């Protein structure tokens, strides 16, 4: 508030060390990014055990110390949902091999992570998440707690990294300057525009859920 900053984003590494514990449990909200593979499916189970463990540890610490201090860890981050990403699309949908893992991860979130987070009140209610999704999407392919589906960036990521520019902000000229022309140029422009809409929708959902 002092510096007119509304949101601070932390990009945490995929581990369950002490630093991640403190950062996550002192946050107001959190989102879990996942890729469609066995390791992310397994990680959902790990989060389902470790977040409640962290919550218990910090609750005990606050009880035995000055837990009412304005600088103490809140210990109640609210789960907004997950972002399914880094999959290969075909005709606008994930190919079957990726869809299998996306469905398995979605099931693990619904059946394992969500119930465990509900026990410690570290989650936004499902109906509120679904309302935010319905309000900010017209495709109908998302449901709580799926906040967004972001496919692989393919060649756009190389241009993005070279220019230090977000994928959705790459200009037509910058794509041409990378050596693209004809059908490839048009395909990359269409992909860039699609990513722009996806990220706009995700931002709107986050704003809706955290306002």
Predicted regions, residues:
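Conserved catalytic-core segment of NTP-binding enzymes
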Residues: 1-118
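C-terminal lobe/tail of nucleotide-utilizing enzymes
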Residues: 64-211
């Amino acid at each position: 508030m002092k510096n007119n900053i509304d949101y601070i984003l932390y990009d945490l590494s995929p581990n369950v060390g002490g630093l991640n514990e403190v950062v996550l449990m002192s946050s107001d909200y959190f989102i879990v990014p996942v890729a469609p593979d066995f390791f992310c499916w397994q990680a959902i189970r790990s989060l389902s055990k470790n977040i409640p463990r962290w919550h218990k540890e910090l609750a005990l610490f606050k009880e035995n110390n000055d837990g009412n201090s304005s600088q103490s860890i809140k210990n109640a981050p609210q789960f907004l949902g997950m972002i399914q990403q880094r999959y290969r699309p075909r005709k606008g949908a994930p190919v079957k091999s990726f869809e299998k893992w996306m469905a398995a991860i979605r099931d693990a979130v619904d059946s394992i992570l969500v119930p465990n987070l509900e026990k410690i009140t570290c989650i936004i209610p499902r109906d509120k998440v679904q309302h935010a999704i319905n309000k900010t999407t017209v495709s109908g392919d998302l449901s709580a707690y799926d906040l967004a589906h972001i496919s692989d960036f393919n060649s756009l990521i190389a241009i993005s990294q070279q220019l230090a520019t977000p994928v959705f902000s790459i200009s037509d000229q910058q794509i041409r300057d990378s050596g693209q022309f004809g059908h490839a140029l048009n395909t990359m422009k269409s992909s860039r525009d699609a990513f722009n809409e996806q990220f706009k929708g995700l931002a709107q959902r986050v704003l809706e859920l955290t306002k």
